[in-house]
Amino acid sequence: MSKLILIRHGQSLWNAANKFTGWVDIPLSRRGRAEAMIAASKLQEQGYRIDVCFTSLLIRAMETAIIALTEYEQLCGGKTPIFKHDADDLDWHGWDKYDGDPKEELPIFPSQALDERYYGDLQGLNKAQTAQKYGSEQVHEWRRSYFTRPPGGESLEDTQKRVIPYFENRILTHIAHGDTVMVAAHGNSLRAMIMRLENLQPEDVPNLELATGIPLIYEVDQQAKVSNKIVLH
């Protein structure tokens, strides 16, 4: 059995300000950095050892991953975390022509496919003020519905269409090899993945809540069929 560890990034500065963030590249707050460290501490205490990590291209997810893997060295078996960029990602410069040493290094693969849902015209707006303007039911539908797009943005269905192919083609490959895989990403990109893992339907999505910095561990077979689920509160 392989283990798949999902972590929503720690609290960001705009989480703290109750703003829609989406693709705006906002860093972690002080609390968010602490959440990343606490999550790593819990994983290490339970004896988990990460073989490979995936993140989005957004700094709050990458910060969460790198804090976890550098502050608690036993979590990655004493290996050095190293970001491995893909040529199809926007931040790839062509300079990291380095294959690496799997005995000494733990690869972190950042990908735009795992980015947060794009909130379009809502990005940067305060959620409470937006609810006052448009109504709480409308804002809740924009945030939690599977099919409804916020103005100029993505629905969760749209998000899932980019997350799942990446999961199937990249993440599942490591699961099939028996690796312990960590994914540090976002509420909606992780919801898309959880729908695949737990065979959830669109009507189940509104009740699917993910707290920042709380590890969610799945024990899975080579096809990512889940046999056990653990939440490390």
Curated annotation (Swiss-Prot):
Group of enzyme by EC: isomerase
The keyword Isomerase belongs to this UniProt entry's keyword annotation: yes
Record pathway: Carbohydrate degradation; glycolysis; pyruvate from D-glyceraldehyde 3-phosphate: step 3/5
Residue(s) at site: Transition state stabilizer: H186
A single BP term in Gene Ontology: glycolytic process
Pfam families for this protein: His_Phos_1 (PF00300)
InterPro entries (alphabetical): His_Pase_superF_clade-1 (IPR013078), His_PPase_superfam (IPR029033), PG/BPGM_mutase_AS (IPR001345), Phosphogly_mut1 (IPR005952)
Entry keyword Glycoprotein: no
PROSITE patterns, per the entry: PG_MUTASE (PS00175)
Single annotated GO MF: phosphoglycerate mutase activity
Residues the record marks as active site: H9, E116
UniProt: substrate binding residues: 8-15, 21-22, 60, 116-119, 127, 143-144, 187-188
Its EC number(s): 5.4.2.11
Superkingdom of the organism of origin: Bacteria
Keywords: Gluconeogenesis, Glycolysis, Isomerase
Reaction(s) catalysed (UniProt annotation): (2R)-2-phosphoglycerate = (2R)-3-phosphoglycerate
Matches recorded under NCBIfam families: pgm_1 (TIGR01258), PRK01112.1 (NF002217)
Protein's job: Catalyzes the interconversion of 2-phosphoglycerate and 3-phosphoglycerate.
The family this protein is said to belong to: Belongs to the phosphoglycerate mutase family. BPG-dependent PGAM subfamily.
PANTHER family assigned: PHOSPHOGLYCERATE MUTASE (PTHR11931)
Name of this protein: 2,3-bisphosphoglycerate-dependent phosphoglycerate mutase
